Amino acid sequence: MNNRGILIVLSGFSGAGKGTVVKNILKTYPDEYAVSVSATTRAPREGETDGREYFFKSTSEFQKMIATGELIEYAQYVGNYYGTPRRYVEEQLEAGKNIILEIEIQGAFNIKKMFPDAVLMFLMPPTAAELENRLRGRGTEDEATIKARLARATQEAEGVEAVSYTHLTL
């Protein structure tokens, strides 16, 4: 019997509700699921702690992780790098935990190549206006960042069909 965990990739536009979904899964099923903590070069938001929400890295530290093969996938998003550390994911799967990766479309495409059995889910808001409301409602980004995230969402929407996603609207 194989007790290896399932790799679940949750993607979606910034502001689609990925973080909320993940928090509810972990609250409801704490012994069955774990979330991968990504590395990033973006600055921490208020209340975020290194190693909990993200591993916050300098650009040079992140580039070293790329060069030494420490990341399963990585991508640049709105001027910052994001990536998934390999060791933690593999340890959780071997321990029988279902591991959730909250990553963008490009990363999901790369994960599916490396882990063909991974389950891919794409979370989207019901309308573009709702997405903008959610981004503004956070109160964590300036106008330029909100506009960049909305522009990126438009680009990502065009790439969703290239990956075998299950689509979820919240």
Predicted region positions:
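ATP-dependent NMP and nucleoside kinases share a basic, alpha-helical "lid"
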Residues: 84-138
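ATP-binding Walker
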Residues: 16
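Walker A/P-loop
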Residues: 19
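Hydrophobic anchor at the beta1->P-loop junction of P-loop NTPases
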Residues: 10
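ATP-dependent small-molecule kinase phosphotransfer cores
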Residues: 38-99, 106-109
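Conserved small/polar residues in nucleotide/adenosyl-binding loops
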Residues: 166-170
